[in-house]
Each structure stands twice: as structure tokens, then as C-alpha cells.
């Protein structure tokens, strides 16, 4: 089973948690895209009914509409039953780094409010500690990015402004902000660092998701494995 097959396997496994009349938070990224497509197929075939999606990004919204999933905004629903999203790193305590898709702020808002948060990853995303492979994305007010990058030196972190690939200039989030990718030597206390980073003036949100995931579905060559609290 290659990586894409692992992604498809965990996406299909996540469908087992979806029931009629649910409001589902739809994450951003390649693995979640499979889930959105599969969910849309079940709705089109009548195997699920009255399921609504709350997208975490413009990308997720467009994918949901293409898949035939009715889309609503966060302020149109009283509650989110379940949220499904990917992650860039997962530590043994189910803490996450997210945000390579630059949608981390809405992801955290929606997933924090969900009754259940399910994370979809392949086994390459499992790490011994957060920061082992990936930097922590930090969404920042554009005018403050340089000052915040300097402030992060207090945390022994090196931060780089994320630049766009298919256009000139930096990546701009759906909220109109910039992304700093901050590399930490080792994140010993993810929850503490998550809170501390958000106290820096100009920081909108950061990509540490500590103590928030309920179930993590991990794609492996042997099949889907589950981590849960």
C-alpha cells in the first residue's frame, strides 16, 4: 500500500463515523480531499441524508460543492457534530502540528468546537515529538511579521516568511494574513507553547493543536490503525 492508498484508506474509514443529519467540519489538504469526495458520493447515492459541511478554507468549500455536499458557514449552525482533517505531525500523545495548507486558524476554530475531531494521516506523519520534522506555522498580521520573527528568537526558534510557489510574494491566508514557519529544536510541552505563542501581539493563531484530537486514523501498509484518548 503506497502513501496515496493509505490516505484513501483512512478517508474511507472516517466515513463510518458520519450519520444522517450531521454537521461535519471539513478540513483542508490532500487526505481530507479524499474524505470530502467519498462523503459527497455517499450523499449523491442516497446512503447518507441531510449532512451539511462546514469548510475550513476556500479550497475545502470548493471541493465540497463539487462533490455535492451542502455547505454552510460556522455562524449558520448551532453545533458541529464531527470534524475531519489531516495533520503534518502527530506525537505519541496525539498532539498535532497543522497548517501546511495555511488554513490553520479556521481549522482550529471549527475543530475546537466539534463534538468529535478525527484526524487522518499516513504513518509518515507520526513523530517522537512535535517539531521533529516540521516547523510550526504561525498566522500573523502582515505588518508585524518581521517583529514577530525576531520575537520568536526568545523561544530559540528560527522563523521564515512562507513564500508562494505559483505567484510572487508571500503566501496570503484566506484571512488576508501571512504565515511564518517557525522551527523549534524540540517541543517538550506542546500545550504550553501553543498558549505562549498566541500571547505575542500580532499572532493570529499557530499550528500546534494540543489536546484536541479525539481519534487519529493512521494509514499503514498493513491497514488502518487507530489512536484514541
Curated annotation (Swiss-Prot):
According to UniProt, this protein's pathway is: Carbohydrate degradation; pentose phosphate pathway; D-ribose 5-phosphate from D-ribulose 5-phosphate (non-oxidative stage): step 1/1
Top-level taxonomic group: Archaea
Gene3D superfamilies found in the cross-reference section: 3.30.70.260, 3.40.50.1360
Keywords, ordered alphabetically: Isomerase
| GO biological process, any | pentose-phosphate shunt, non-oxidative branch
Record's function text: Catalyzes the reversible conversion of ribose-5-phosphate to ribulose 5-phosphate.
Q: How does it assemble?
A: Homodimer.
Please report the name of this protein according to its UniProt entry.
Answer: Ribose-5-phosphate isomerase A
